[in-house]
């Protein structure tokens, strides 16, 4: 089942989320906005199983990577009533 995976600009390019993902949903891409010159990207969200290991691995105070499961997606994006 595919889940929505969002990468935020608080990403520090550490690769922890990429290494934690058991289904290779995430990858690093070049980005000049951080010291590491790379940022996480989620090109294969259809393979996301919703384990949230990427969230657990993220060392930033505000999670740079978030996985939204089903109804959680619309609620967090302000689309649910």
Swiss-Prot record:
Highest rank taxon of the organism: Eukaryota
Gene Ontology terms, MF aspect: 4 iron, 4 sulfur cluster binding; electron transfer activity; metal ion binding; oxidoreductase activity
Catalytic activity: reduced [plastocyanin] + hnu + oxidized [2Fe-2S]-[ferredoxin] = oxidized [plastocyanin] + reduced [2Fe-2S]-[ferredoxin]
One protein family per Pfam: Fer4_21
Cofactor, how bound (note): Binds 2 [4Fe-4S] clusters. Cluster 2 is most probably the spectroscopically characterized electron acceptor FA and cluster 1 is most probably FB.
EC main group: oxidoreductase
GO biological process: photosynthetic electron transport in photosystem I
GO terms for cellular component: chloroplast thylakoid membrane; photosystem I
Subunit architecture: The eukaryotic PSI reaction center is composed of at least 11 subunits.
Name the record gives this protein: Photosystem I iron-sulfur center
């Amino acid at each position: 089942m595919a889940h929505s995976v969002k990468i935020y600009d608080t990403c520090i390019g550490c690769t922890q989320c990429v290494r934690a993902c058991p289904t290779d949903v995430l990858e690093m891409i070049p980005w000049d906005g951080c010291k590491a010159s790379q940022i996480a990207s989620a090109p294969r969200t259809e393979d996301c199983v919703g384990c949230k290991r990427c969230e657990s691995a993220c060392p930033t105070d505000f999670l740079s990577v978030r996985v939204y499961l089903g109804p959680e997606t619309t609620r967090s994006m302000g689309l649910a009533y």
